[in-house]
Amino acid sequence: MLENVDSKDIPLNEENANFKRRKLINYSLILLGIVVLITTIIVVIYALNKEDQGEQKQESDFLNKIKANFVVNVSGSKTKLINIPFDKLNIHLFINDKETNFEYEYQFNGTGEYLVEFRFNEELTNLSSLFMDVINLKKIDLTGIVTDKVKNMDNLFKGCISLESANLNKINTFNVESMKSMFQGCNNLIKIDMENFITSSTKITTSMFENCYNLSEININFFNFTNIEDANSMFKNCYLLNQITLVNNNESSNTNMKSTFNECHSLKQLNLEKFGKKNIKEISFMFNNCYSLESIDLSKFDISQVTSIEYLFSNCSSLQSIDISQLNFNNVEYMGYAFRYCSKLTSIDLSNFNTSKAKTISGLFFGCSSLENISLNKFDIKITSIADLFNGCTSLKNVALKVDDVKHVDRVFNNCTSLEVLDLSEFNGLGIAFYINDFFPKIDTASIIYNSSIFGKNLEKRIPEGWNKTDINNQTN
């Protein structure tokens, strides 16, 4: 059989085998390449996914975010865009979405505005002085900040003179106890969104908005004064603020409201409809220079502990009516200039005006040019000074006054140009009460014993005809 085999078949079979072998190798290489490619893709996808998960995890570690706009206006010089005391906080700072150090110097020619985001890695319990004196802060949004355990917000934005708007709408202030000087000196601040601001736990609001000269709108349902102990100068010098609502449902707390609305020139209405009985311990200067205030009802204020009402309504030139008939003045010692320049006030009910502890009522009605009649003869007045008491009361026609052992009566009836009847039958001293007057009403002087310089200089020339001068003593000049 071997003899029948063609020798030419042998090379052909080997060639076929080699071809098949090469073909198999090529297929194997292609398959290996596909496997490598798939493996590479899987590895890349895994790596990308892991990196993304890492970023997400890092992102989840940021408990708080604050977004703010900063403005730089310099020319060819370096300036610090950010300089905020975050030394006790682990934060990440992003300027225009680029992470950087929290102190950031910037070389700039012209004017620029930068979006800055603060991300905190830890729980916040104190925001005191966080942005204080950051003078290039323009806008702030605290929507993303977690403040559940924050108790102190003192000086948070104090001195931020470029701040125009602040969104505090969604931050939790339930546990905040002190907001002293929170926005003090933000003199360009126009609007604050505090719609969901809760102050039920707050005790200190001293100077909270003081010197916010341009603040015209506070978007807040109400300020809850239930536990507030000190509101001294809270809205002082808020020239453009025209309306505010106060709420209180706790009679026990004693609150300092000295100068609370002092210099609120545009304040027309103080809404106290939901204001329960409130113990007040300081009230002087409370409405001083509130030129636009037309009426006020303080019947819900318990002032039994108050010792001074000095300048309480001074320069309230639009005030037409005031109800103080329910107020307890038993402990008030100082009443000086309380109604000074209330030029539209025509009458006032003083039936409950207890002056048993009063030491001075100087200038009490100074410049009340529309006041026509007043009676103080039922008062228990044992005071040292009534100087300027009715000075400038140009419409005053009838006065009854009872004062014992007073020492200072300077200008008490000065410029009372309409005065017709003056009952001084229980008055024992006039001093220089009419020092520069050229007119004199009908006066009963029977019991007057001390009248040094009552008419100023040239006494004899200035005493009106018909006066009873027989019992007048001590007429030295």
Give names to the regions the model predicted:
Residues 1-15, 235, 261, 390:
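Disordered, charged N-terminal biogenesis/targeting segments of membrane/secreted proteins
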Residues 8-16, 20-149, 222-224, 246-250, ...:
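N-terminal capping/linker segments that flank leucine-rich repeat
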Residues 114-122, 136-149, 161-177, 187-203, ...:
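Structural signature of tandem-repeat unit edges
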Residues 128-129, 154-155, 180-181, 206-207, ...:
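Register-specific detector for alpha-helical tandem repeat solenoids, activating on a conserved position
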Residues 132, 157-158, 183-184, 210, ...:
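Ankyrin-repeat helical core positions
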Residues 389, 412, 438-440:
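Small/polar residue-rich beta-strand/coil "junction" motifs that cap repeat-based extracellular fibers
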